[in-house]
Curated annotation (Swiss-Prot):
UniProt KW tRNA processing keyword: no
Catalyzed reaction equations: [(1->4)-alpha-D-glucosyl](n) + ADP-alpha-D-glucose = [(1->4)-alpha-D-glucosyl](n+1) + ADP + H(+)
Highest taxon above the source species: Bacteria
Annotated binding of ADP-alpha-D-glucose, by residue: K18
NCBIfam families (UniProt xref): glgA, PRK00654.2-2
Enzyme class, spelled out: transferase
InterPro entries on file: Glyco_trans_1 (IPR001296), GS/SS (IPR011835), Starch_synth_cat_dom (IPR013534)
A GO cellular-component term linked to this record: cytosol
Organism: Vibrio cholerae serotype O1 (strain ATCC 39315 / El Tor Inaba N16961)
Gene: glgA
Keywords recorded for this protein, A-Z: Glycogen biosynthesis, Glycosyltransferase, Transferase
UniProt-recorded Gene Ontology molecular function terms: alpha-1,4-glucan glucosyltransferase (ADP-glucose donor) activity; alpha-1,4-glucan glucosyltransferase (UDP-glucose donor) activity
PANTHER family, per the entry: ALPHA AMYLASE DOMAIN-CONTAINING PROTEIN, GRANULE-BOUND STARCH SYNTHASE 1, CHLOROPLASTIC/AMYLOPLASTIC
Listed GO biological process terms: glycogen biosynthetic process
Protein name: Glycogen synthase
Length: 484
């Protein structure tokens, strides 16, 4: 097995800073690559909230010319054996949050992450790090492949270096005006007009798609959706242009974090052995009900942990939620996001206190409790590049109810379509009614076929979405990027 030296550039890493699923991937994939004897290091902004900065090793003090804030430092620390290089420029990153405050994005985000992308390349010769592959992620580092092919095109240090871009969510395109990105003169070079998005703006994600040697989406089905107008969110021509270089690789599950046999968050651990699962999940359900002041009773419990956004399908769930609550069920939703969604959920919780609990916060502990204590997990997403919660749910014997988009279609087998290999429930139609029918289908399954449900739960728990397999797929893509 050949060894690649991978420079992983990303805006968040679980265990240091996290706002979403990108951080989970950014921790787990480098670790999986390292376990396969690859050389990997991560570049991350030195946000105020990164723990252990004061104890990190100062490895470089330098400057990036042509920037309003040119001085920056590089701090080095370790995360579970993977070196992390923190790009420390307080003017850009010493702030209370990563991207936004009070639901308002920082006005200079384009400049901030343009700087970070430029610094990710600037530090390599200065630190003597010679990667084979530079791995960019989403719009935040979309300019890394672009700068590699423009600013560093004739630099002998970068002559053999190839880049890949992982698209975790194409709806976030990193659109900023040319004025906001005037610190990157390469964007105004002749022939770069195709990077324009709308009038006088440029998309940092588009730049990455165009200039990376290989591009991947975080599931095969999402890669296929990116080649359609509906799935590409305004970038269909860009993805079609790169169709031969576009790959789909399903995210893995970090089973060291999400494993009901060893989960330190849970009030009771359990395995896929029937008696262990029955007993363990019952204890977890009781603890969840007590925590959320729901009646402690053995009724089917439907859970949901996510951001409160259109993407997560609340425009499908909210119109039918109260109708569904007429059944003898309980529903638990945990998350933060759009104020109007939260307001409606709070109102429903007020009128249905015995059946519905809404917790407007994100808690890692509570997320684990919902995964273990629920019987079903709701994911009626408008779109879902890969999705991780359906994989976590299956690991905990909690059957996912998914709209079959993106990675949800790749990872969950619907009971009605595939009874012999079912791991949950799926549907396709983008309507509240289709969601309600599927939830009712799951409810009847719980009530009428308890032994069959136990078999499906066992099968779900036995699914293996290990990062080792995903990392091997990434290595195949690295090989293609490097050697063709």
């Amino acid at each position: 097995m050949e060894q690649f030296n991978v420079w992983f550039t990303v805006s968040e890493v679980q265990g240091l800073v996290k706002s979403g699923g990108l951080a989970d991937v950014a921790k787990a994939l480098p670790q999986a690559l390292k376990a396969l004897h690859q050389q990997v290091a991560i570049a991350l902004p030195a946000y105020r909230s990164v723990p252990g900065k004061e104890d990190a090793e100062l490895v470089l003090e330098t400057e990036l010319t042509h920037w309003p804030h040119t001085q920056y430092r590089v701090l080095k620390r370790d995360l579970d054996g993977v070196p992390i290089y923190l790009i420390d420029c307080p003017a850009y990153f010493d702030r209370p949050a990563l991207y936004a405050e009070n639901n308002q994005a920082y006005a200079d985000n384009g400049e901030r992450f343009g700087f970070f992308s430029a610094a990710c390349l600037d530090v390599l010769p200065k630190l003597g790090i010679q990667p084979d592959i530079i791995h960019a992620n989403d719009w935040h580092t979309g300019l890394v492949p672009f700068l590699l092919k423009t600013r560093y095109r004739y630099d002998s240090f970068f002559e053999q270096v190839k880049s890949v871009l992982t698209v975790h969510n194409a709806i976030f395109k990193g659109i900023f005006s040319y004025h906001q990105l005037e610190v990157i003169p390469e964007l105004n070079l002749s022939g770069m007009e195709f990077l324009q998005y709308g009038h006088d703006h440029v998309s940092m994600l588009r730049a990455g798609i165009a200039f990376a040697d290989k591009v991947n989406a975080v599931s095969p089905n999402y890669a296929a959706e990116l080649l359609t107008p509906l799935g590409a969110h305004g970038l269909v021509d860009d993805f079609v242009r790169r169709a031969r270089d576009l790959h789909g690789i399903v995210n893995g599950c970090d089973y060291s974090e999400w494993n009901p046999r060893t989960d330190h968050y849970l009030p009771a651990t359990y395995s896929d052995e029937p008696e262990s699962m029955r007993k363990g999940k019952a204890l977890c359900k009781t603890a969840l009900q007590e925590e959320l002041h729901l009646p402690v009773t053995d009724v089917p419990l439907f859970g949901m942990v996510c951001r409160l956004t259109h993407q997560k399908g609340f425009h499908y769930l909210l119109p039918i939620l109260e109708q569904f609550l007429r059944n003898n069920v309980q529903v638990v939703i945990v998350g933060t996001g759009e104020p109007e969604v939260a307001a409606r959920l709070n109102k429903i919780a007020h009128y249905h206190r015995a059946k519905f609990a809404f917790v407007e916060t994100y808690s890692e502990r509570l997320a684990h409790w919902v995964e273990a204590g629920s019987d079903f997990f709701l994911m009626p997403s408008e779109f879902e590049a890969c999705g991780l919660n359906q994989i976590y749910s299956m690991a905990y014997g909690t059957l996912p109810i998914v709209r079959e988009v993106g990675g949800l279609k790749d990872t969950v087998n619907d009971y009605d379509k595939f009874p012999e290999r079912a791991t949950g429930f799926g549907y396709q139609e983008p309507t509240p009614e289709a969601l309600l029918i599927t939830m009712q289908r799951a409810l009847l399954f719980y009530l009428q076929q308890p032994e069959e449900m136990l078999k499906v739960q066992q099968r779900a728990m036995q699914q293996n979405f290990s990062w080792e397999e995903s990392a091997q797929e990434y290595m195949k893509m690295y090989r293609l990027a490097r050697f063709g």
